[in-house]
C-alpha cells in the first residue's frame, strides 16, 4: 500500500491478520479521487432517473455530484488509509499505569446493508504501557473507522485492534452505543431502540475489577 504512514500500514496489517478488515475487492486499477467521483456521479444519475426524478430541476441537478463528493471525501473517507490520522505517541515517562478513558466520542457511520446512518457515541479506555497517545487521536481513530460502510460489531473491534497495535498493549476496551436508521427509518421502524457493542482486551477481559471499572465509566457511574 504505497504512500501510507507507518502507523496506517501497521493497523491495516493487524486488521487483515485478525480477519477484521472491511471487505474490499482488489482494485482493478488505481483511480484518482476525481475520476472516482465522476464515475459515481454517473451511476447516481442513472439511479435517480430510474426513480423518475427530474434531474433538470435546479434542486436535483447537482445531487449526483454532491453524493459522489460526500462518499469519497466525507462519509467513506475511511476506506482510504491515506486518510488515517497522524498519530502522536508520547513516551510514558510518568509511568502511568491506571485506566485512561475518553467518553462520549461522537460518531456517525453508515450501515453497510442499507447505506443509511448509524448515529452513536463511543467510550474508549486503555491502560498505558510504554506509550500514551494524544487524546484527540483516539477520537480521530474512532471517526476514521466510522467513515466506512460498517456493521457496529466490526467497527468496535477495528477501533480496539488499531489502538492495541499503536500502543503496544492488549489493555484496551471499546464500547459503542448507537441508533441504526435501518431499524429506525425503515423495516420495523423502531424509533427508540439502540444497540450496544463492547470489545475488551487484556486486563479488561481477564480482570473482573478492571472490566467493572470500565463498564462503570461507560454508564457514567462514579
Swiss-Prot record:
This is GTP cyclohydrolase 1. Zn(2+) binds at residues 111, 114, 182. One of its GO terms (biological process) is one-carbon metabolic process. Its EC number is 3.5.4.16. PANTHER family: GTP CYCLOHYDROLASE 1, GTP CYCLOHYDROLASE I. Pathway: Cofactor biosynthesis; 7,8-dihydroneopterin triphosphate biosynthesis; 7,8-dihydroneopterin triphosphate from GTP: step 1/1. InterPro entries: GTP-CH-I_C/QueF, GTP-CH-I_N, GTP_CycHdrlase_I, GTP_CycHdrlase_I_CS, GTP_CycHdrlase_I_dom. Disulfide bonds: none annotated. Homomer. Keywords: GTP-binding, Hydrolase, Metal-binding, Nucleotide-binding, One-carbon metabolism, Zinc. The keyword GTP-binding applies. It comes from the Bacteria.
